[in-house]
Amino acid sequence: QHACLQAIAPELLTGGIGRLIHAVSAEHQDLTRSRQRHAVLVKVHAASLNPLDWHYMRGTPYIMRMQAGVGAPKDSAMGVDFSGTVAAVGKNVTRFKAGDEVFGGRDGAFAEFLSVGENKALTLKPANMTFEQAAAVPIAAITALQALRDKGGIRPGQKVLINGASGGVGTFAVQIARSFGAEVTGVCS
């Protein structure tokens, strides 16, 4: 598999997909999305399951069916949160290089490989985190950050109550609120 990836990744990243489409096995179909010059091809090492995935699979609340599909999911590539190693980069990518350990959020995170835009939800994995730990961060942390900073307008000295402080989003909310200098009270069951 690794030799196959090395052989076809440059063609995929430069748009030579027509010559290679039949050479890519079914399990590597996500590689075909890597033809963009600003794409980062990630070999996924870990992916986490979060409520978004569960709602997507269950089709509840019913509004999810508009995106997911009425009878069954339209897209079999499930998952959002992931971590892994950069396998290849498009010719215009400057922030990442092959071998970098990264984590982020993108539909299809349960796949073996993902193509992620360089300027999308992708960043270097801290060296002190395992791949599994990093895969648990993206959606929960982004949700907490957006709620506190963007919607809540958090500021130093502000008193903040975090309901559900022991959950996925709540754990990040406590840490993020503290990093903004807020006085935090956490509530959990």
Segments and roles (model prediction):
Residues 3-16, 31:
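Hydrophobic, low-acid, alpha-helix-prone terminal segments
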Residues 33-83:
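N-terminal glycine-rich beta->alpha transition that marks the start or flank
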Residues 40, 102-103, 160:
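Generic structural signal for buried aliphatic residues
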Residues 57, 83-106, 180-181:
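A glycine-/small-residue-rich N-terminal strand-loop-strand element
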Residues 106-119:
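A structural motif shared across PLP-dependent enzymes of the aminotransferase-like
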Residues 134-189:
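Mid-domain Rossmann-like dinucleotide-binding core that forms the NAD(H)/NADP(H) cofactor-binding site
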